[in-house]
Each structure stands twice: as C-alpha cells, then as structure tokens.
Amino acid sequence: MTKKSKIDHYSDKEALDFHIAGKSGKIEISSSKPLTTKRDLSLAYSPGVAAPVKEIAKNPDLAYDYTSKGNLVAVISNGSAILGLGNLGSLASKPVMEGKSVLFKRFADIDSIDIEINSNNTDSIIETIKNISGTFGGINLEDIAAPDCFIVEQ
C-alpha cells in the first residue's frame, strides 16, 4: 500500500509518476521567435544578436524590449524550509521551485526559472541573488527558513 498525502489524497507513487512522466521535471524552454530557416537562426544568435547587444549597452532599459527580462522571474530557494518538510537542502527543493515556476506560467503567463542556491550562509545567498538579479524582471524567494528569509528579503 502506498502512502497517501494528507493534503491532496494522492499517493507518493502517483506524485512520483507525475514528475517522471514524459520529460523529467515540469519546466522547459521554448523559443518565442521562429527558428525554421538559417536566416532565423542567424537573427536569433550570431550575427543578429549584435544589434540588440549594442542598443542595450547604450541603454540598459532596452533589455526589457529586446529580451525576455520583463517577463522572467527567478524562483529562488536554498531548501532550508521546504513546504513543512524542513531543511532538506537546495536540490530537494527543486520540484517545489519548478512547481512555482509552472504556476507563474499557467496563471499569469510569466516565464520563470528555478534557481537553487546550495548555501545556508545569508551573505552568500544575498550575494548570489544580487549577482544574477539583472537577468530577471522579478525575484521570488521561496522556502528559505526564518530568520534568514527576512534578512535576504531586505
């Protein structure tokens, strides 16, 4: 007999089967532009990227026009307070962060990527977030234990 979740009445086996079916995990990346011809590929990558690169270098706000930044959220955790399960580590938090990412997509059409930081050092977590924050239009902090979560949020 498989163990049932108290919350949704799904067995652990059903949940594991859901996560492993088809492609593993719950998120994937797809192109918002056509990539059917050599020209498309050249515009999407090299040499076509040179034009928006130069424009963004002159005016960083143009990153919102020429890239996905404005519709991209980082869902970040260190896994120190996973959904009532406790501190199970950053990698174990990945299914939760992927789940939050698909909720962003499903209910707000916001693209999101999960980022698990393998550290319990508040300064290290803050530094990592600061260093990657320019890539994203938003940062969602998730399942970071108190009191560190309040320090990181500030």
State where each predicted segment sits.
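N-terminal ligand-binding/catalytic initiation module
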Residues: 2-154
